[in-house]
Amino acid sequence: TEIYTLSLHDALPIYKKDEIALGISFNYGSNHNEREIPFAKMHCERLGIKHITIDLGFMHQYFKSSLLEGADAIPEGHYADDNMKSTVVPFRNGIMLSIAIGIAESNNLKKVFIANHGGDHTIYPDCRPEFIKAIDEAAEAGTFVDVRVVAPYTNITKGQIAEIGKKLGIDYAETWSCYKGGEKHCGKCGTCVERKEALAEAGIEDTTEYEE
């Protein structure tokens, strides 16, 4: 019994679906929400998993991040570059996981999955192992049913995740990465760069349509 909260790496947990009861997307006003959420819904429907979208529009109003300020505000370059720190939405995972944990307990579900990965650690504090450990402990301590937060990809790369997805037969053309949220992947932002690298590392033909 699991609850799941789609990008390239997010697709993987729902294809290991023997326990998953619910998929959650959060619409928090990011540039790419409108591109990413339909893919999440599509994959859940294909696998017979209930999917819901929760509106967190207030984050766009009160939180500071280039991810919430339009495509032109998104920096280009690699995830490791300092300028990519502008894409951090403060405590985003903490907020979303807290909501998911509450929904899990309300439905007597025992686990909440998150698909953060090793490449996130450089700039996203709420993707790091110490954060995952802390919120897992908080979830267990703060719920009657001892909800646990499960983050199986915390210490592996996006390329390794892509390799697992390849074995599961996932079509990565049916996922979204680009932070700019245009009609096509821009090919230059941090997530696009890492997407290209991950697919190449896994030996997967990249059929993504890039602007450049």
Regions found by a protein language model. Give the residues of each.
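Short, intrinsically disordered, charge-biased short linear motifs at domain edges
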Residues: 1, 164-167, 172-181
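Glycine-rich nucleotide phosphate-binding loop and flanking beta-alpha elements
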Residues: 120, 199-200
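Local cysteine-cluster metal-coordination motifs and their immediate loop/turn environment
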Residues: 98, 174-197
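Short cysteine/histidine-rich metal-coordination sites, predominantly Zn2+-binding motifs
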Residues: 181-182, 202-212
